[in-house]
Amino acid sequence: ITEDIVRSRYQASIQPGAQEAFSAMFPAPRQRWVHALASPEEAIRALPHETLVIHGREDRVIPLSNSLRLCALIPRAQLHVYGHCGHWTQIEHAGRFARLVRDFLTE
């Protein structure tokens, strides 16, 4: 993660109302909302579409094992793992990420 990304995220977090907005999206207890957003395995297995799963190998927010599990469940999934990348593949590898998504959507 670059200093620019750190600075950008910090600046966003100290904007007036930022903390309140986050808390409103995920009120305590936060894990309850994570579970509420989860889909049952049967629904995931039933996905009929080509599915692109993208993950940063060094992601400390969501373990890579989650994406590996998704790909095991989704019949038509493909996984792309970016090395030297944390949670924000779309920022940390913006150009490569955009090309990958564009190519996936235009196939």
Task: Please tell me what each predicted stretch does.
Residues 76-107:
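Catalytic active-site module of serine/aspartate enzymes centered on a nucleophile-bearing elbow/loop
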Residues 40, 63-72:
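Short alpha-helix in the alpha/beta-hydrolase fold that links the catalytic acid
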Residues 32-34, 58-62:
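Acidic catalytic loop of the alpha/beta-hydrolase fold
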Residues 56, 63-66, 92-93:
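Active-site helix-initiating loop/hinge in glycosyltransferases
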Residues 47, 53-55, 59:
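Short beta-strand/loop motif that positions the catalytic acidic residue
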Residues 50-52, 75-78:
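Structural signature of beta-strand start/N-cap positions in the alpha/beta core
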